[in-house]
Amino acid sequence: VDLVLNNNFDGIDLDYEGFAFVDGNTTWTKTAPRWVALVKELSVALRSHNKLLSISTPYVYDPKEKQKGYFVYAWADVASSIDRLRIMTYDYSVAKPGPIGPISWTEKTLKYAVSIMSPSKVFIGLPGYGRDWITSVQGKCPVNAPPGLKGGAKAATFKTSYADTKAA
């Protein structure tokens, strides 16, 4: 709260991704109540100074669904304590080729979010990027490869993007 007040910020955005992506979901049942307590306590303190609290999180699905997404963020439990929910509707496919933020996935996430809080609180992060995935391996890197490339390593071929194809 001091950071917000001392810098005359409108509020603060909590973007805690470590417990979702680093700790793993085996810790989530213990982490979720602590997260909720933090959000609620910070909300009370910020609102006493007329300041905003937003949270940025990956997707969460309706708990009635078979897949729950990143349920550790407990949207339903923090909905009344936040002013904005910023949903990361990107990185659906990371390690394997696929869409970055498919519409059906984004819609499912948004439907749940607006079912538990005012739609005016819900914001989405849209992917403005693409990824290159290795699609085939041909040959080996030269022995005198530049720094950062291992000489003799397998050489990768990347799928050509639509923009590259159009420009050619």
Where are these regions (language model features)?
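Chitinase-like catalytic core of GlcNAc-active glycosidases
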Residues: 1-105
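Alpha-helix capping and helix-coil boundary motifs
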Residues: 27-30, 118, 161, 165
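Short glycine/proline-enriched coil/turn segments at helix->beta-strand junctions
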Residues: 49, 118-119, 127
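Surface-exposed substrate-engagement region within the catalytic domains
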Residues: 73-79, 87-88, 109, 114, ...
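Short, surface-exposed, polar/charged, turn-prone segments marking secondary-structure boundaries
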Residues: 83, 112-116, 150-154
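Catalytic-core region of carbohydrate-active enzymes that cleave or remodel glycosidic bonds
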Residues: 101-119
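Glycan-binding loop/region signatures in secreted carbohydrate-active enzymes
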Residues: 128-168
